Regions:
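Extracytoplasmic
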Residues: 1-136
Length: 136
């Protein structure tokens, strides 16, 4: 498995790091509502070719947007994914849950990424925490 956590990223100025233990790891990132397009990229590279399921750790906050827009790149193509907060069930006493972004054929030497974006239209906060790749 490969995990890319927010702690390993160069964070754009519009995003705020929240130092709390209610996400994956010790922190997560928040983007407040803005009309300016903002993105945050979680880059990854696999060491062996194969099919991988990609997840993100979804954090539910009272101020969160109902929709979170992402772009997943397998190193060749990009695919848009929209997470609807109303369709994600957070179980137990956590404030988040691993949510699948789909299965992708990934190749060694072809870096990919998961990118969070607001497209300048989101009305609530966007939370970004971690990305997980699990080989199938």
């Amino acid at each position: 498995d490969i995990i890319v956590d927010d702690a390993s990223l160069d964070v754009p100025a519009a995003w705020t790091r929240i130092e709390k233990n209610n996400g994956y790891g010790r922190s997560y990132l928040v983007l407040n509502p803005t009309s300016e397009k903002q993105t945050l990229r979680y880059p990854f590279e696999v060491k062996s070719d194969g099919k991988y399921e990609i997840y993100t750790y979804f954090i539910r906050r009272g101020e969160s947007s109902k929709m979170t827009e992402l772009v997943v790149s397998d190193g060749n193509e990009q695919k848009g994914v929209v997470l609807n907060a109303d369709e994600i069930e957070v179980l137990g006493q956590t404030s988040g849950e691993w949510v699948s972004l789909g299965e992708y054929n990934l190749q060694s030497g072809k870096p990919g990424y998961v990118e969070f974006t607001n497209n300048g239209t989101i009305t609530g906060q966007i939370c970004a925490d971690a990305v997980l790749l699990v080989r199938k």
